[in-house]
Each structure stands twice: as C-alpha cells, then as structure tokens.
Amino acid sequence: MAHTKVAIIGSGPAGYSAAVYTARALLAPTVFTGPESGGQLMYTTEVENFAGFAEGIQGPELMFAMRAQSERFGAVMRDELVTAVDFSQRPFKIWTELPDGTPYELYKMGKPEELHEVMTTLRKTEPQWTADAVVLSTGASSIMLGVPGEKELLSKGVSTCAVCDAAFFKEKTVFVVGGGDSAMEDATALSKFAKSVTILHRRDSFKASKIMQERVLANPKIKVLWNTQVLEILGAEKVEKIKINENGVEKELPAEGVFMAIGHKPTTQVFADQVQLDGHDYLVTRQSATKIGLDAAQAALTEEGLIAYPTMTSVEGVFAAGDNVDVRYKQAITAAGQGCSAALDVERWLERQ
C-alpha cells in the first residue's frame, strides 16, 4: 500500500490544472488518469477557444502539454483506473485493482447495482493507495447512441461538441441528434457555419425550452425531422451518409457531420455512495450552481461572509472540479480554472490540518 499527500482522480483540463498547482505547492500529487487519459479533448480535433493559442491547438496536443507541464513540477502520473474509494475517514482509501474475473467494461457500461457489488467487495480488501486529500476530476462523457459507425467515425465527422467544432463544418451538411436545450444550442451554433442543419428527433415535439425552440424553428437554415431514429453512420475515412428511420421508413441521407446532443453523463459512479450527488449525478460542492450547492455554501460561510473551500464536496478533504461538477458551462477553459481553484483549496485546507 502506497501513500500520497494529494490524489487527483481523473485527468483532462481540470485534473491536469489541479496537478500543476498542487505540484508547484510541493504537495507531490499523484494523478490517477485512468487508462484513457486526457478526457473528452482527446476526441476533439481543433481547439480554438482555449485562450493563449492564436492559431488553435489539437485537443490531444493540449492534453499532452498539460500532462507534461504537471510532470515537470513533480506530479506523478498513474495510468490506472480507480475502481473504488472509501472516504469515511482519513487517510482516504483508494483501490486501483479489480476482483478476478471482473471486466473493465463494467465501469463504462455496467449496471449501478453490479458496480456497487464490486466496490463493496473491494472495500473488504486492503487498498492500493491512501491519501490525505483528494480532488475528483473525472469529468463527464457525452451520451452516445451506440449505433454502428458512431465510435469508428468519432472526430471524423461525428462530434459531441458543436461549440468546439462548428467552424470546421463551414458550408457542409450536418445533422444534430437530440431534442433538448443542448440540441437547440448546437443547431443554432452550427447554422452560423454549415450549409444546412437538420435536427433528428425521435419524438414529435421538443423538450427544450420554448424560447430555444422558437429560435430554432424560425431559423431558415435549420430543418427538423420528427419521429426519426438514427440507425447507422456511414463512411470510410469520414462521415459520408447517415441511415435513419423516419416515421417507419428507412432511408440514407448524405451527411458530412453528425453531432450528438442527447446529454452528458457525469463520471461519478465510483463516488456515488461516498459523497453527495445532485439529482443528475453531478458532484455537489459548496459553489455548485444548484439549490443543494447553495445550502452547502450557506453552511460553510466564514466570519467574513466568504465560502470556506468552495470546491469542497460533502466530505471534508475531498474536492471536485471540472465537468463532473459543472452543470452549466462544460468548457475546457472553465474546467481548467476549476482545477486551479480546487488545488488552491487543497493547499489551504492541508495547511490547517
């Protein structure tokens, strides 16, 4: 069993920024990046809205640079999946192994009850790590359809971030899958660049807010196909067609881009019974933009009227940053800022222990 003063669970902009700041504070953080380090930006081609890169930067390149920067200051990277935690007492316990015969896929597609059973089994064994403080920066992942061609053509015309990639689809034919606010926002953003935007929605009405629906339906560049399901995304090296079922009729349509906008799911299942989550499985901190977060903030006010350790979760010594907390913005640069904030909170909290 090994010990680290600060454990950062998850990589991406939030985790790597937290690593840079805690490492510079001489806290020698250990970053558990998981086997797929770098987060959602590893699937993003050009990043043009991250301040400091006048010509833009490739998503993977940005993540590699942030990782190298944190390592330069002394952060230790562990490309391991955190399989269970115990935050009931300090030092906190962290497991990075799976019971014999348990597949890694359980942590990506397994049922909550199955995952809970595995974690309960692990907590009866000796952990691989302990930590004095923990930063949770596991992010969130876009919910995907699971249709053929989707995974193979990701970053080759299939995207989960219209804000990030819209400019690369200038004068192209694109489709947006979804019917909520995210789909409306994506379609509107894409309409500024694309030749045509078609929203594919499986129902006969949107669930988005009325004002966002009105904007979309009034936009001459946006078309809606109701009662439509995506069956397959076709293409060799890039998206070429999309196969759909519209009102019971199957057809193939030419396509150059397909944007998934059916929601995001925070990666918090490993912490579900250890820290407080909101109704949508996002981690609750003292600065969360939710009623639960406001209540937590009110209870943590200092004599000066400030929130003590805004990034702290419901467990003292456990902090959170990035898209597993952020219910609103979900941008790389805001995640990086939250990672910085969490690191500073960790440093100040440890000084007082």
Task: Briefly describe each language-model feature range.
Residues 184-186, 304, 309-310, 315, ...:
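A conserved FAD-binding loop/helix module that cradles the flavin
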Residues 3-5, 79-80, 170-172, 227, ...:
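Phosphate-coordination loops involved in phosphoryl transfer and adenosine-cofactor binding
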Residues 141, 146, 152-168, 262-329:
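FAD-site-proximal beta/loop scaffold in flavoenzymes
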Residues 67-120, 129-131, 191-305, 348-352:
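A Rossmann-like FAD-binding core segment of flavoenzymes
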Residues 77, 136, 160, 224-226, ...:
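A structural signal for the hydrophobic beta-strands that form the central parallel beta-sheet
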Residues 19-20, 43, 146-149, 187-189, ...:
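Short amphipathic alpha-helical segments
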Residues 9, 136-137, 176, 260:
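Redox-cofactor binding/interface segments in oxidoreductases and associated redox assembly factors
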Residues 4-73, 178, 182-210, 225, ...:
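Beta1-alpha1 glycine-rich phosphate/pyrophosphate-binding loop at the start
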